[in-house]
Amino acid sequence: MKRIFSAVRIEPGELFLKSFRDLRSGLCSEPIKWVEEHNIHITLKFFGETDERQIPGISSSLAEIAQNSGDLNFRLSGIGIFGSRYQPKVVWAGIEPPEPLALLMKTVQQEMLKHGFESDRQNIVPHLTLGRIKFLNDRVLFQKLIDANKAISSPQLIIKECILYESILQREGPRYIALRKFPFGK
């Protein structure tokens, strides 16, 4: 069994990373599990623990989807939260425009139904997860820093491939290994 997911790798640029570091630094006393900079990606589909015999079929489907897809052009724009203002669960950066990435995510999820994987969610909201929140000690400070970083953005990004990753959970954080890359064909 391998814990796997498909994703697009993101290199958001130094200005975005500086804002991200400032946000993390300002919230360093909060129990937020931040994404490591070298692990920044946008998940297309999380498969979880998967029988290794399924990986060739998954790879074949991802290769076909990628071959029929064009490069993705978008920028990271704004910071938001999933959950409520009182119980935030995830800190994320938005995608602008979201439609091409949403279409790719929907296509991947629909194709993976054929391999026995359920859809992850009803409403697909393309986003870059920055951190996961267990609880907050200081909600006022948290909201102040989120509001102060609402304008965070990246330059235009051009994504030319999707990747099937293995996720190995370790005490110091997950380690991602690219199992296969699928270049976009259009």
Protein language model features and the residues they cover:
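Active-site loops and adjacent core secondary-structure elements that bind or stabilize anionic groups
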Residues: 162
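Helix-adjacent hinge/juxtasegments
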Residues: 70-104
